[in-house]
């Protein structure tokens, strides 16, 4: 019987809100979920990148997206704020779907709590142009 998210996953979901706020976003997307998971050393080892590398890759993806519409900010791309807003940000529909899907991975593992690795598995299922899929591809 699945009991819900583990303490580690709860912490990752809170960090995802912080990651979204640091990037100036008003909703938590799948990319923010991935960045939050990269705070965990075990998940970072599975992905092959830590949160700093993930944030750098996300900034480069932002830069490329802006360049694609003719905006080249060069080195003037605003730096992330050093302090995130603490308000609870809503999840995008894709992020809600990934969190929900992580329960199926926990069920398949026959465990009672959803762990960060289960959310990572759900994010790895996402296809481009989903933000987590694009970020995972950029991380190699």
Report residues per predicted region:
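Histone-fold recognition with a strong bias for associated Lys/Arg-rich disordered tails
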Residues: 1-140
